[in-house]
Amino acid sequence: MELSVHTFVSLDGVMQGPGGVQEDPSGGFDRGGWLVPHTTEGQLEPVGEWFGRADAILLGRTTFEMMRTYWSQVTDPDNVVATALNTGQKYVVSNTLTDAGAAWGKTTVLRGEDVVEQVRRLREQPGGELQVHGSWQLVRTLHDAGLVDVHRLIQFPVVVGAGKRLFDGGAVPSAYRITESHVAAGGSGAVALTLRRTASGTTGAGEFVVRDGRESTA
């Protein structure tokens, strides 16, 4: 399976608490819900497409508990996101959860210190996509281990100014290419992007130079 990461992100890279004031107040974050005023009809349509591709979903503990609380209440059979989360295979990284499966459908808890190797083995299973949603700390761990194949983002035209960022200081340098992009419906200016890891995965380096009076690269 490919490992894909799905994120709502601000112009300054913040991914913390986009959907509500109390969604993730950890670290004293008091700017939760920053996405909501910028959401218009049709703008989040790509999210349904994301979940429609999922063979399994991988979450960190905090995101798992937040999603379980909210999405387990959604019983609309036409809601693609709710169907994927409530009935599909889920994996949650946690050393403390004990009732995940009983409380929310088909859920397997990944325990221990070898999370990267456990996820690596999941990727080796047949299937389409192993999807990560939210899960800031887990995403950073998987990125630094070189396990993320695809990022799908919806970037909103707002600067939050504080909070957990998708790529904070010290992230392993990596290169991606944009394979899909479009301005989301609704007119607020949000941009949906799909970025696929390049074959080398490295950023490389170069410089601009002038040769015979012409600008070039080296």
What positions do the PLM features span?
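Enzymes that bind and transform nitrogen-containing heteroaromatic metabolites
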Residues: 1-218
